[in-house]
């Protein structure tokens, strides 16, 4: 499974390099919309700069005469992409961990132990059949403390999705209401309140905005921090290998 590459533009909070300290060629690239984050020393005595453009990490390299800058990847003699490593280490991985903290702080429907080997956040729609299948598949893992699941309900698949989501969240025991709904294949409907509390409406809207910010275009959208502390993403029903990785938190 590939490491999830998050939309980083909203998460880069550290100060960026001041334009006045940049060589003229790098300043010209900055004027084209590349945000320069920090300098770094590249192999071979080459000066490099780390940046981002529209949420994607980029590396720039200054020629020895200081008159030209090259945007792209640097490889070593063994074919290793050295640029990709610094982009991952300095941008994607820290941004992923920052996003994971946000996901952990969000209210949701929790199932399983806080001591489980792998903590999982899943965005789900009440009318999503793949979400239901995933919920059923992970129940044994939840029961044996391999996983804990926090479900963030969204309302995107049907006009009544939001109504069902808010009714489940408004229940006296949202976790039980969700479990009953999923276990019954959606036949055990939640009790619908006369009106949706504003806080629940805002929560569902926030869930949807967060899912979109993460780049997910469908449900279930599954996230977890693996044993290497890398944020992982699965969109849709996990295949056999993805389920094995999830169960092992790798």
Describe each region flagged by the PLM.
Residues 116-126, 132-196, 212-217, 237-238, ...:
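Structural alpha/beta surface segment adjacent to cysteine/selenocysteine redox centers
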Residues 1-5:
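Positively charged n-region of N-terminal signal peptides that target proteins for export
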């Amino acid at each position: 499974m590939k490491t999830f590459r998050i939309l980083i533009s909203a998460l880069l909070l550290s100060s960026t390099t001041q334009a006045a300290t940049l060589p003229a060629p790098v300043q010209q690239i900055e004027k084209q919309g590349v945000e320069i984050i920090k300098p770094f020393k590249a192999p071979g005595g080459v000066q490099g700069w780390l940046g981002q453009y529209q949420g994607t990490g980029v590396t720039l390299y200054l020629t020895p005469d200081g008159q030209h800058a090259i945007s792209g990847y640097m490889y070593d003699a063994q074919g290793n992409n050295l640029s990709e490593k610094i982009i991952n280490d300095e941008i994607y991985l820290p941004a992923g961990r920052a996003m994971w903290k946000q996901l952990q702080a969000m209210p949701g429907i929790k199932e399983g132990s806080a001591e489980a080997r792998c903590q999982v956040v899943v965005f789900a729609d009440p009318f999503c059949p793949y979400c239901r299948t995933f919920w059923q598949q992970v129940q044994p893992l939840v029961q044996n403390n391999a996983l804990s699941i926090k479900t963030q309900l969204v309302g995107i698949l049907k006009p009544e999705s939001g109504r069902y989501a808010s009714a489940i969240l408004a229940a006296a025991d949202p976790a039980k209401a969700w479990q009953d709904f999923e276990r019954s294949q959606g036949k055990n409907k939640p009790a619908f309140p006369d009106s949706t509390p504003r806080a629940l409406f805002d929560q569902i809207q926030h869930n949807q905005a967060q899912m979109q910010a993460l780049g997910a275009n469908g449900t279930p959208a599954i996230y977890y921090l693996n044993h290497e502390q890398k944020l992982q993403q699965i969109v849709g029903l996990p295949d056999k290998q993805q389920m094995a990785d999830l169960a092992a938190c790798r």
